[in-house]
Regions:
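A glycine-rich dinucleotide-binding beta-alpha-beta segment and adjacent secondary-structure elements
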Residues: 40-53, 230-236, 290, 294-360
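Hydrophobic, well-ordered secondary-structure elements that form the walls
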Residues: 125, 171, 255, 284, ...
């Protein structure tokens, strides 16, 4: 389409290259950037505390405008998965649920699951946890140079950790949508205190985790009091964007905030996870009821929550991460948009990677993009070998 190339693509290219240059110059952590431009520490906290630790500045500061432009499918985000399922089955594909892959053998191009079923493949696209892939891949029958490259990448993958996870509270409220529509929008961030978290979720939390065995339950709960009272909550009310998402006269609400997987893991090992989770829920409800949504607790019909452990258990995501890797100076995957096409490559023959672990920073758009890039590579391989 020469018209598209000359009228759209070529005029757009200089702006794209200029934007890429700006992005690459703003890779430093948002905390460092704000340190230089915002003198009030509480204000710095309120701006940055709902971002993952060391989030690149370009990603963090753009989010304030990007999330306002989000479009949601009618019926909820789950409709995306349903549409994908329907398309796969329409084209003759098969989806195996409740199945865990336990072995990948690139030499023989086979993989096995937890039911001891073996599958042969021509090309494999791994769209799940990358640490898992590098733990279960069997490389003994691969050439020595391939094994050497694989071991170097494997060490890098296993030496890094997933980013922070989230605690998500789901609420069923006996109150019409109009009541909440007078207070807020369908998706917003709310910080009840002007103080900011300070070191509550950084130094204080790390000190607590280092000496968790010596810290009593009461000390942990006192820390939790501060953590919830000073935090920032991401609140979603789907019914305000799609009225069919809630029964007449009722409202569904989703409240999320960043949470540390290791904390929940240590509480679980100490034997009081249910009590801790209930305590988190109660404190969140109290804060919201006392501030932005007066009387919310009195109108509550039901509730349930998802913890970092829940995400790990449901989808085998390392450290319960929801956006892939923790942000480090040396990332284990591609993190520059101009070479994003390389993000799907692995050292394993005929194995490609996609999803939130394949590129950093990640999210739904990059997960979709890496899926398309990996599919293109696999299709090209099939055509080449015909």
């Amino acid at each position: 389409d020469t018209s598209y190339i000359f009228r759209k693509l070529l005029p757009w290219m200089p702006r794209f290259l200029l934007t890429v240059g700006k992005i690459n110059r703003m890779q430093l952590p948002v905390e460092e950037f704000l340190q230089a431009v915002v003198k009030n520490p509480s204000l710095r906290d309120i701006i940055s505390q709902h971002f993952f630790r060391n989030t690149p500045t370009f990603f963090a500061l753009s989010y304030f405008s990007l999330y306002l432009d989000y479009f949601y499918p009618r019926g909820g985000v789950g409709k995306l998965a349903e549409a994908l399922r329907d398309k796969i089955t329409e084209l003759g594909g098969e989806i195996k649920t409740a199945t865990l892959v336990t072995r990948v053998s690139p030499g023989s191009k086979t993989l096995s699951d937890d039911k001891n079923t073996s599958y042969a493949y021509g090309n494999l696209i791994w769209a799940a946890d990358l640490k898992t892939l590098y733990r279960i891949a069997e490389t003994e029958d691969l050439p020595a140079e391939v094994r050497t490259r694989y071991e170097a990448v494997r060490a890098k993958m296993l030496g890094n950790r997933g980013g922070e996870s989230v605690f998500t509270l789901f609420l069923e409220v006996d109150e019409p949508l109009a009541h909440f529509g007078r207070i807020a929008h369908g998706h917003f961030f709310y910080t009840p205190s002007r103080q900011g978290l300070g070191e509550t979720h950084r130094g204080e939390l790390q000190a607590l985790l280092r000496d968790f065995g010596g810290a009593g339950k009461e000390e942990v709960l006192r820390w939790l009091d501060r953590f919830i009272a000073l935090n920032t909550f991401e609140v979603s009310i789907p019914g305000l964007k799609d009225r069919d998402m809630a029964p007449p006269g009722k409202t569904g609400m989703i409240v999320s905030f960043l949470a540390e997987y290791e904390l929940f893991k240590k509480v679980e090992e100490a034997g009081w996870l249910d009590e801790f989770v209930a305590g988190v829920e109660q404190r969140v409800l109290k804060v919201l009821s006392d501030t932005v949504f007066p009387g919310l607790r009195d109108k509550l019909m039901d509730r349930f929550s998802f913890t970092p452990l829940s995400y790990h258990q449901r989808i085998a995501s390392s450290e319960g991460a929801i956006v892939g890797w923790a942000f480090q100076k040396e990332m284990p995957v591609i993190n520059k948009i101009q070479i994003a096409d390389r993000s799907v490559l692995t050292p394993l023959p005929s194995v490609y990677q996609a999803g939130q672990w394949a590129y950093s920073p990640a999210g739904v758009p990059m997960s979709i993009l890496t899926g398309k890039l990996a599919a293109d590579r696999a299709i090209a391989s099939v055509r080449k070998n015909r």
